[in-house]
Amino acid sequence: MPTAPLRVAVVCSSNQNRSMEAHNILSKRSFNVRSFGTGTHVKLPGPAPDKPNVYDFKTTYEQMYSDLLKKDKELYTQNGILHMLDRNRRIKPRPERFQNCKDYFDLVITCEERVYDQVVEELNSREQETCQPVHVINVDIQDNHEEATLGAFLICELCQCIQHTEDMENEIDELLQEFEDKSGRTFLHTICFY
């Protein structure tokens, strides 16, 4: 079993739904966790599919909540966006971009293949300093509230199993295979170095 707690990052596109739901569940189970997005802007559903609400990553969850409350309280209550932002603002002040974080993690879990590719590209573009390995694992999660919750519990279970391995480097492939068989999902996995 690792002596230190796993340092975990969960990454989706806008650091709103999937990564924040996993952040919430992992932090309640005492994991050392942070969450991020990889997009250039934060996008939330708007009044129509072609009219999203777009924010800068510097915008706080509180500011987004207030803005949407003013725009259309009924719509954003009904579609769950205000509830999601309320949860988010209780976890941390604002969304964060993975590309702007220079902290080291043992495990980076992404929520879709495009985000996985962006994280791997970012990590591989950095100059190696410590040669410390970081495992990047993709768990495909549809971007809706129900799937975010189911995906967060799967991510939590995966992190708990990895935390309890004797030798993460040698056991992770077998562990991921077991999770694939059990969940019916395919996980992408690679190792990058800091």
From Swiss-Prot:
It holds the Pfam family Ssu72. GO terms for cellular component: cytoplasm; mRNA cleavage and polyadenylation specificity factor complex. InterPro entries: RNA_pol_II_suA (IPR006811). It catalyses: O-phospho-L-seryl-[protein] + H2O = L-seryl-[protein] + phosphate; O-phospho-L-threonyl-[protein] + H2O = L-threonyl-[protein] + phosphate. Keywords: Coiled coil, Cytoplasm, Hydrolase, mRNA processing, Nucleus, Protein phosphatase. Its EC number is 3.1.3.16. The keyword Ribonucleoprotein does not apply. Residues 160-186 form a coiled coil. One of its GO terms (biological process) is termination of RNA polymerase II transcription. It is found in: Nucleus; Cytoplasm. Gene3D superfamilies: 3.40.50.2300. One of its GO terms (molecular function) is RNA polymerase II CTD heptapeptide repeat phosphatase activity. It comes from the Eukaryota. It is an enzyme of class 3 (hydrolase). Belongs to the SSU72 phosphatase family. May be involved in the C-terminal domain of RNA polymerase II dephosphorylation, RNA processing and termination. This is RNA polymerase II subunit A C-terminal domain phosphatase SSU72. The lineage of its organism: Eukaryota, Metazoa, Chordata, Craniata, Vertebrata.
